[in-house]
Amino acid sequence: MKVEELPFSLEQLRILKAIATEGSFKKAAESLYMTQPAISLQIQTLEKKLNIALFDRSGRRALMTEAGHLLLRYGDCILALCEETCHALEDLRNLQGGTLVIGASQTTGTYLMPRLIGLFRQRYPQVTVKLHVHSTRRISWNIANGQVDLAVIGGEVPHELQESLTITPYAEDELVLILPKSHPFAKLESIQKEDLYRLKFIALDAQSAIRKVIDKVLAQNGIDSNLFRVEMELNSIESIKNAVQSGLGAAFVSVSAIAKELELGILHWCRIENITIKRMLSIITNPNRYHSQAARIFSEEILTMFSLQSPEVKKRALSIIQNT
């Protein structure tokens, strides 16, 4: 039997339940703010469609038949599920439940998102948050395919997806040069750009989003990174930091990735004179997909915390997440 062909309605199930609860048609009508004739008509219509008697009317009182009790039992389950569904939807609207799936590129997913998610969960503890960390390219395709609700990335969205996704910048992320504490340059606050050719480098894979940003900015300032002495290429920021700490070379990393190391004094970072390497951090969403209330609020909180129009707000936000 198809749903559209069901011989009963939710309203009729509510009436049947009210009759069983109140003990009579009259009291059921009063509890439902209906007239008794209206109640009787609904039950008669229901019996006709079911082709079975729900009440025995041979005595002074109408008594529920076996069929009536059977329908009542299943009707109670149906009404309970309907009520549960309404509560679940209401919970989602009020951020009292549901799941938020967030995508993030490697650096933002490792160092920034756990803190932001922690702050979000303090306010909305009933929302389950799932974080998927991959390359910017893969996360962008996850958004396009509807596998994640929103993503926070530090690289460029693949060209073939830029027209189909909504890209919202929210902050700038500075990429800095880190050195072992034992390196002679560790005593300096800044170095000349020519000094870069004297360093041994630990680098990310050439296809990584950060590597592309670094190479592009350096090239714009007359520095050919292809001439650097790259001792090794690694695929994670953590392994790069460990290699630098071990004295194997220098590296460019996001400043957000070294807060702990700077606090402990186990790494040094210095500027390159007259050169600042920055990249834009962005929230990406798919305008053709449904955006949950949780996803919208999470995005809004990021935009508020990292307001590009207010350096003071941004500074305060960075302080909050680094000390969380």
Swiss-Prot record:
Segments forming domain HTH lysR-type: 8-65
Keyword DNA-binding: yes
Entry's Gene Ontology cellular component terms: cyanelle
Alphabetical list of CDD domains matching this protein: PBP2_CysL_like
Domain of life: Eukaryota
InterPro entries given in the database record: LysR_subst-bd (IPR005119), Tscrpt_reg_HTH_LysR (IPR000847), WH-like_DNA-bd_sf (IPR036388), WH_DNA-bd_sf (IPR036390)
PANTHER family xrefs: HTH-TYPE TRANSCRIPTIONAL REGULATOR, HTH-TYPE TRANSCRIPTIONAL REGULATOR CYSL
Family: Belongs to the LysR transcriptional regulatory family.
Function of the molecule: Trans-acting transcriptional regulator of RuBisCO genes (rbcL and rbcS) expression.
The protein, known as: Probable RuBisCO transcriptional regulator
Native species: Cyanophora paradoxa
